[in-house]
């Protein structure tokens, strides 16, 4: 039961931070797809950094709970995969297949690069 609590608290924090970032960046009149890309890139980087740093805490008694809190709860909630999929679907419905493919390739590529960069920074 306590594992669910760690995931839930992390998810609450991640969702609220995502909301705040989206709200603040939305005031800049950026494209919705670009906002989602920024948030997902940040979450991917943070997850990579966290997972590289968590290795240093393996001996720590609560390392498993930290993993639940951050990797599943916080970063899982911070990223906006469902919004990303919705944008792809919406572009396909509008027959904007090239834009959908471009969004897919850019988002996945940047997400992987951001994750790897976070992982790399954490091991330095």
UniProtKB/Swiss-Prot annotation:
Major localization listed first in the record, in broad terms: membrane
Keyword list, A-Z: Cell inner membrane, Cell membrane, Ion channel, Ion transport, Membrane, Metal-binding, Sodium, Transmembrane, Transmembrane helix, Transport
Record's bilayer topology term: Multi-pass membrane protein
Listed GO biological process terms: cellular detoxification of fluoride
Binding site for Na(+): 76, 79
SS bond partners: none
Pfam families assigned to the protein according to its UniProt record, in alphabetical order: CRCB
Molecular function per GO: fluoride channel activity; metal ion binding
Matches recorded under InterPro entries: FluC (IPR003691)
The family this protein is said to belong to: Belongs to the fluoride channel Fluc/FEX (TC 1.A.43) family.
Protein name (record): Fluoride-specific ion channel FluC 2
